[in-house]
Protein backbone atom coordinates (compact mmCIF):
# COMPACT_ATOMS: atom_id res chain seq x y z
CA UNK A 1 0.00 0.00 0.00
CA UNK A 2 1.27 3.47 -0.81
CA UNK A 3 0.46 6.84 0.71
CA UNK A 4 -1.50 7.86 -2.40
CA UNK A 5 -3.83 4.88 -1.84
CA UNK A 6 -4.95 6.67 1.33
CA UNK A 7 -4.41 10.38 0.64
CA UNK A 8 -4.79 12.63 -2.40
CA UNK A 9 -1.56 13.07 -4.38
CA UNK A 10 -2.54 16.71 -4.95
CA UNK A 11 -2.99 17.34 -1.20
CA UNK A 12 0.36 15.68 -0.47
CA UNK A 13 2.10 17.81 -3.11
CA UNK A 14 0.62 21.03 -1.69
CA UNK A 15 1.54 20.11 1.88
CA UNK A 16 5.12 19.13 0.98
CA UNK A 17 5.49 22.42 -0.91
CA UNK A 18 4.14 24.44 2.00
CA UNK A 19 6.91 23.13 4.27
CA UNK A 20 9.78 23.13 1.75
CA UNK A 21 11.77 25.73 3.69
CA UNK A 22 14.14 24.50 6.40
CA UNK A 23 12.71 24.62 9.93
CA UNK A 24 9.20 25.40 8.65
CA UNK A 25 7.58 22.02 9.46
CA UNK A 26 4.44 22.13 11.61
CA UNK A 27 2.95 18.66 12.08
CA UNK A 28 -0.52 19.97 12.95
CA UNK A 29 -0.82 22.01 9.75
CA UNK A 30 0.84 19.27 7.69
CA UNK A 31 -1.55 16.53 8.89
CA UNK A 32 -4.50 18.81 8.14
CA UNK A 33 -3.18 19.75 4.68
CA UNK A 34 -2.57 16.16 3.54
CA UNK A 35 -6.08 15.21 4.71
CA UNK A 36 -4.90 12.84 7.43
CA UNK A 37 -6.99 14.58 10.10
CA UNK A 38 -10.19 13.66 8.22
CA UNK A 39 -9.29 9.98 7.82
CA UNK A 40 -10.76 7.10 9.81
CA UNK A 41 -8.72 5.73 12.74
CA UNK A 42 -8.03 2.64 10.61
CA UNK A 43 -6.61 4.74 7.76
CA UNK A 44 -4.46 6.73 10.21
CA UNK A 45 -3.01 3.42 11.43
CA UNK A 46 -2.31 2.39 7.82
CA UNK A 47 -0.37 5.65 7.33
CA UNK A 48 1.58 4.89 10.53
CA UNK A 49 2.58 1.49 9.18
CA UNK A 50 3.79 3.07 5.91
CA UNK A 51 5.93 5.53 7.92
CA UNK A 52 7.29 2.75 10.17
CA UNK A 53 9.98 1.83 7.64
CA UNK A 54 11.69 -0.88 9.72
CA UNK A 55 8.33 -2.42 10.73
CA UNK A 56 9.28 -2.30 14.42
CA UNK A 57 5.82 -1.11 15.47
CA UNK A 58 7.28 2.30 16.31
CA UNK A 59 8.43 5.39 14.46
CA UNK A 60 11.84 6.04 15.99
CA UNK A 61 13.67 9.37 15.94
CA UNK A 62 15.72 8.48 12.85
CA UNK A 63 12.55 7.55 10.95
CA UNK A 64 10.89 10.81 12.03
CA UNK A 65 13.63 12.75 10.28
CA UNK A 66 12.45 11.23 7.00
CA UNK A 67 8.70 11.52 7.68
CA UNK A 68 8.07 13.86 4.74
CA UNK A 69 9.73 11.36 2.39
CA UNK A 70 7.14 8.83 3.57
CA UNK A 71 4.54 11.04 1.91
CA UNK A 72 6.62 11.99 -1.16
CA UNK A 73 10.02 10.61 -2.13
CA UNK A 74 11.27 13.99 -3.36
CA UNK A 75 10.47 15.79 -0.09
CA UNK A 76 13.18 17.16 2.18
CA UNK A 77 14.40 15.65 5.44
CA UNK A 78 13.40 17.33 8.69
CA UNK A 79 16.09 19.24 10.55
CA UNK A 80 17.31 17.87 13.88
CA UNK A 81 15.29 20.60 15.63
CA UNK A 82 12.10 19.74 13.72
CA UNK A 83 12.61 16.03 14.41
CA UNK A 84 13.04 16.63 18.17
CA UNK A 85 9.96 18.88 18.24
CA UNK A 86 7.87 16.23 16.46
CA UNK A 87 9.16 13.49 18.76
CA UNK A 88 8.36 15.58 21.85
CA UNK A 89 4.82 16.23 20.58
CA UNK A 90 4.12 12.58 19.79
CA UNK A 91 6.04 10.59 22.40
CA UNK A 92 3.50 10.64 25.23
CA UNK A 93 5.12 7.88 27.32
CA UNK A 94 8.68 9.21 27.02
CA UNK A 95 10.23 6.05 25.52
CA UNK A 96 11.94 7.95 22.70
CA UNK A 97 9.70 6.67 19.91
CA UNK A 98 6.12 7.01 18.68
CA UNK A 99 3.80 4.00 18.76
CA UNK A 100 0.66 3.58 16.69
CA UNK A 101 -1.66 4.87 19.43
CA UNK A 102 0.61 7.86 20.07
CA UNK A 103 0.61 8.60 16.33
CA UNK A 104 -3.19 8.39 16.22
CA UNK A 105 -3.39 10.83 19.14
CA UNK A 106 -0.88 13.16 17.48
CA UNK A 107 -3.03 13.26 14.33
CA UNK A 108 -6.33 13.68 16.20
CA UNK A 109 -4.89 16.58 18.23
CA UNK A 110 -3.80 18.41 15.08
From Swiss-Prot:
Q: Which UniProt keywords apply?
A: Acetylation, Calcium, Metal-binding, Muscle protein, Phosphoprotein, Repeat
Per its UniProt record, what SMART domains does this chain match? Answer: EFh
Protein's UniProt name: Parvalbumin alpha
Q: What note about domains is in the entry?
A: AB domain, comprising of helices A and B, is involved in structural stabilization, protecting the hydrophobic core of the protein. It is required for high-affinity binding of Ca(2+) and for Mg(2+)-binding.
- One Pfam family here: EF-hand_7
Q: Per UniProt, where does Ca(2+) 2 bind?
A: 91, 93, 95, 97, 102
Modification sites for Phosphoserine: 2, 8, 24
Please list the residues that carry the modification N-acetylserine. 2
Q: Which family does the entry's similarity section mention?
A: Belongs to the parvalbumin family.
InterPro entries named in the record:
EF-hand-dom_pair (IPR011992), EF_Hand_1_Ca_BS (IPR018247), EF_hand_dom (IPR002048), Parvalbumin (IPR008080)
Q: Which domain of life is it from?
A: Eukaryota
Organism listed in the record? Gerbillus sp. (Gerbil)
| The EF-hand domain, residue ranges | 39-74, 78-110
Q: Where does Ca(2+) 1 bind?
A: 52, 54, 56, 58, 60, 63
GO CC annotations? cytoplasm
What is the protein's known function? In muscle, parvalbumin is thought to be involved in relaxation after contraction. It binds two calcium ions.
Q: Name one GO molecular function term.
A: calcium ion binding
Taxonomy, top ranks, is: Eukaryota, Metazoa, Chordata, Craniata, Vertebrata
Amino acid sequence: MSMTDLLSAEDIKKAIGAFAAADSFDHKKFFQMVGLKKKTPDDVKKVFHILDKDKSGFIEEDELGFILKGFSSDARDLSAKETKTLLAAGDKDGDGKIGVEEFSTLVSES
